[in-house]
Amino acid sequence: MIKQRTLKNIIRATGVGLHSGEKVYLTLKPAPVDTGIVFCRADLDPVVQIPARAENVGETTMSTTLVNGDVKVDTVEHLLSAMAGLGIDNAYVELSASEVPIMDGSAGPFVFLIQSAGLEEQDAAKKFIRILREVTVEDGDKRATFVPFDGFKVSFEIDFDHPVFRDRTQSASVDFSSTSFVKEVSRARTFGFMSDIEYLRKHNLALGGSVENAIVVDSDGVLNEDGLRYEDEFVKHKILDAIGDLYLLGNSLIGEFKGFKSGHALNNQLLRKLIEQKDAWEVVTFEDASTAPISYMRPVAAV
């Protein structure tokens, strides 16, 4: 049986919020079967919990924000991408502020944290959402689509009219039955343009942004001294973001996501449309792991 997973141990980290610039303390904790991923604002009294679900998404400008009343948690997508990539079903994410720390701008540090905590299988079947028919949302020339696929695949195309992007791959398709999330996607960093930074800061966004936690692009090229981690790092980061946004379904997916210039807002619209159209998906479990179209790294002992 493919079983649900949580963390073996509690693990902590410190970082800054990309948009707030605030110092943030992050604690990842094990959670019982069928809890899902739950964000907890531990700085509030009483503590406010926000389940990582599509219906709890509020703001989608520059990042994905979860809300519960007037309480919010910003920039959840990179951590959720790491949770999805490692098959973590249940965990509590405690935060000392309103934003998940940006770390290095990728999901890599979160993967390291989760692997350091160790993974633990739980005594319940893992539930997957299987896509049964095509579902699409569009906004102008932007598009996001689910199609049936026997596995999990993410295809994405970006279209930036900028010399740095024109010289590099702007489309990628990753089939996770044959490609490692950890090796091929998790280290792709978020990116931004120098020309936008003044505007963003004026609107209290990207206050914590720097070449330490983002790829910064100007008219001549990439400003980061160490360059890119992957030749197609820009589009790979969009795939990383999409995986995090899709995990707001609350379960791992069996199907393919196709994005063309899609962002957090359109990704969330697609999830909401899918949830409404109950004939477009089903929940499945696998008593025999060998029959499943998806496999995960074996749980390893905490280091």
UniProtKB/Swiss-Prot annotation:
GO MF annotation: an example: UDP-3-O-acyl-N-acetylglucosamine deacetylase activity
Catalytically driven reaction(s): a UDP-3-O-[(3R)-3-hydroxyacyl]-N-acetyl-alpha-D-glucosamine + H2O = a UDP-3-O-[(3R)-3-hydroxyacyl]-alpha-D-glucosamine + acetate
Domain of life: Bacteria
Biological pathway: Glycolipid biosynthesis; lipid IV(A) biosynthesis; lipid IV(A) from (3R)-3-hydroxytetradecanoyl-[acyl-carrier-protein] and UDP-N-acetyl-alpha-D-glucosamine: step 2/6
GO cellular component: membrane
UniProt keyword terms in alphabetical order: Hydrolase, Lipid A biosynthesis, Lipid biosynthesis, Lipid metabolism, Metal-binding, Zinc
Transmembrane segments: none
Residues where Zn(2+) binds: H78, H237, D241
Cofactor: Zn(2+)
GO aspect biological process, one term: lipid A biosynthetic process
Active site per database record: H264 (proton donor)
Protein EC: 3.5.1.108
Stored InterPro entries: Ribosomal_Su5_D2-typ_SF, UDP-acyl_GlcNac_deAcase, UDP-acyl_GlcNac_deAcase_C, UDP-acyl_N-AcGlcN_deAcase_N
Function: Catalyzes the hydrolysis of UDP-3-O-myristoyl-N-acetylglucosamine to form UDP-3-O-myristoylglucosamine and acetate, the committed step in lipid A biosynthesis.
HAMAP family recorded: LpxC
Record-stated family: Belongs to the LpxC family.
Protein name listed in UniProt: UDP-3-O-acyl-N-acetylglucosamine deacetylase
